[in-house]
Amino acid sequence: MFLDFMSEVEGILKEGLDRCGLSVPLENSLDLSPHADLSTTIAFRLSPVLRKDPKDVAAEIYNSMGSPSRWVDRAELVGPYINFYMSRNFLDNVVTKAQGEDAWWGRRSGSVVVEHTSANPDGPLHVGHIRNSVIGDTIVRILRRAGYNVEAQYYVNDMGRQTAMVVWGCDHLDLDDSKPDHAIARVYIAAHKIMNEKPELSAEVDELMRRYESRDPEIVKKFQRAARYAISGIERTLHRMNIHHDSYKWESEFVWDGSVDEILEMLERTGRTVLKDGALQLDLSEEGFEKSLVLRRADGTTLYTTRDLAYHKWKAENYERVVEVLGADHKLISAQLRTALRMLGIGEPEVVIFEFVSLPDGSMSTRRGKFISADELLDEVEKQAYLEVTKRRPEMDEEFRRDVAGKVAVGAVRYDIVRVSADKATTFDWKTALDFEKLSAPFIQYSHARACSIINKAGELDEFDPGLLRDDYEIALIKKIAEFDLVIERAARELKPHQLATYARELAERFNLFYRYDPVLDAKPVELRNARLGLVRASRNALSATLDTLGIDAPESM
């Protein structure tokens, strides 16, 4: 929708540039403006090159442009800016197109793998993990919405020391009958405590790691049974949050199929590896890193970083775009890995680094045994959501209230996490996240439910004339609906899911302003009533597509 308007503006602008004898790429030269539907600042970019005042440059381009056509009503010269405005035909087309399904899917193509969550199989997810999961899953949904063929992937760290500690714990301690990931965590924490009290036992964990890497059949069964058991519990939490992975890749795959050996040989051929105390290391001092990257321990076992390089090589060979979501504590190692990949001529991943999310009560740690799990957080938010739904809809039965509370709780958690730019730390506060009146997920969900209610009360919608929608609230809402594909396109390109969260809030705001000031069911004459019903249906579809892309349920009644 909006991209069609932008494409026509680009054509008009390019015609003006060509007539002026100017060849300049139009990327990032057009943007939304409070004073117009689109505005270009291209004159500022050309001014120093042409050694002319930006106003004069803009005037030359403006005077050389062709006439507006299908989607562009007019262009205006305002100082150094050229502003563009949507035509009535375009606005009518938005409302008409938004009645169907095709409007909400992009035209991109190509394969993308997005690796996210990838928590160690040693316990349940905590709030820090789920910021990774929510950001990652929302990126997956945005890329799919843009048209890409996307695979969501979980990388299982089955060869790490934490997993070996779990295996040792399962050999020496009993698993309780709680949710699998929680049961594994209790064994892990108890094993960690024993190791602290009896450090000599750590040699047994080292031996487990060595035997697993050498593919000892008995040990392989133990490791994979423990890891799969933990992941089965983690999956239940993720599914509760509408998060699903398409595939799981295990670290061990890349050791056993020779990929890690191949990476080590490639790195040694660079002439940049050194042996230090028996360990093979990659010297990255020329690239500005003080510490070398350890590739293989003195005992011959590989490290997470080496296996990760093999995994990245596999991804680069099998997908056109490679995206991974990592916590801020991975910044250094991620930079080192990307440097190593560059040295080998392997395509680098697009990395989304997120800062941490916390609760008002403090941080969480699996090793110390003091953490607030994602399950506990979701249970508490759902309990509070149930109280709010009961207060608002006491006449509804228990099943309805429980169902809505579950959808509202997950929406509240997901939205509150994703609304903040990934590079900013945030604190989750359920009171703010569950506020139905403020700009939160429940506010957006309620806007969708309100649109559904209006449509249900109206019954069958006859044909309508979108040209009757002419007041400020109607036009503002139509323009916001049109922006959906632009927001998806930019968020997919820049991997910034918070942009879609912002759009969802603005769309709900525009819809509620329209609803407040423009009667729908009581509108007269009937032609205007039908036109506004058409706009309500377009709004419902836009809200539904937006919430779906955010991984948030869109209840028809709240």
Curated annotation (Swiss-Prot):
Keywords: Aminoacyl-tRNA synthetase, ATP-binding, Cytoplasm, Ligase, Nucleotide-binding, Protein biosynthesis. Its EC number is 6.1.1.19. It is found in: Cytoplasm. GO terms for biological process: arginyl-tRNA aminoacylation. GO terms for cellular component: cytoplasm. A motif ('HIGH' region) lies at residues 119-129. One of its GO terms (molecular function) is arginine-tRNA ligase activity. It is an enzyme of class 6 (ligase). Signal peptide: none annotated. It catalyses: tRNA(Arg) + L-arginine + ATP = L-arginyl-tRNA(Arg) + AMP + diphosphate. PANTHER family: ARGININE--TRNA LIGASE, CYTOPLASMIC, ARGINYL-TRNA SYNTHETASE. Belongs to the class-I aminoacyl-tRNA synthetase family. This is Arginine--tRNA ligase. It comes from Methanothrix thermoacetophila (strain DSM 6194 / JCM 14653 / NBRC 101360 / PT).
